[in-house]
Amino acid sequence: MEKGHIIDQDLITLIADHMENGFLENIIDMFRHDRGLYPLIGGLIQDERVRVRVGITALMEELKKLDTVNVQGAFPGLLPLLAHSEPFVRGDAANLLGIIGDKRALASLEKLREDENADVRLIAIEAIEEIHLQHSAADVLSGDQ
């Protein structure tokens, strides 16, 4: 486990550094060709550099369009971050869960409506709305209104 953790942390650092340097397109290609990278999203979104976190959000927005099925791979690493001590991590995780659109996040996001941080509360509400919107649109498209 130790070796895998070290490799993951090295890869998280590498991806974050590339994101900070503006290599979003390259990172999109990496994720599209290796779905095993999705579990690293939870580690990446905890980076203290704003440019990295904004880039990870852009990455997930783009991958939601290009690689819809595989973005679910980020879900398990993001859900526990809704209880993180740092408000920016809770908020960013909530935002990414909204982008992913998995209904399994709804109960945990509902709890954030009572978060001590106003920004986190707002982001959680927006994420909940986004998930409902995505599923309403999917129901309309499939005829399951």
Language-model features: locations:
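Structural detector for internal amphipathic alpha-helices that build alpha-solenoid repeat scaffolds
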Residues: 13-33, 46, 51-69, 88-102, ...
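Amphipathic alpha-helical scaffolding segments comprising HEAT/armadillo-like alpha-solenoid repeats
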Residues: 2-10, 32-46, 65-81, 102-114, ...
